[in-house]
A protein has these predicted regions:
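Short S/T/G/P-rich N-terminal loop/turn motif that feeds into the first structured element of a domain
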Residues: 1-27, 39, 43, 54, ...
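Short, structured coil segments at secondary-structure junctions
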Residues: 29, 64-67
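Helix N-cap motif at beta-to-alpha junctions
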Residues: 49-55
Length: 78
């Protein structure tokens, strides 16, 4: 499955909500969180997601009212 990284503001999400998202099963758009990296001091959140396509990532965020600053398809060395 393709992998994506995106960035957006952390607020209004809480650390508890991030943990729930990290452990959540695949959503209705086919998206799962591989990792969530954040900085509370800079109010910045980076999501590493597995998703069928960029549109699924957009819908995943739109559902909770978040618009990412960017979404990029990425590869890993693993």
């Amino acid at each position: 499955m393709p992998k994506f990284i995106d960035a957006h503001k952390m607020n209004p999400l809480t650390k508890q909500q991030l943990k729930q998202a990290q452990n959540a099963p695949k959503d209705e758009f086919g998206v799962t969180h591989e990792n969530i990296i954040y900085s509370e001091t800079e109010n910045k959140l980076f999501c590493v997601l597995n998703a069928p396509n960029k549109e699924a990532v957009e819908k995943h965020h739109r559902k909770i009212g978040i618009k990412p600053d960017y979404i990029h398809e990425v590869k890993t060395t693993k």
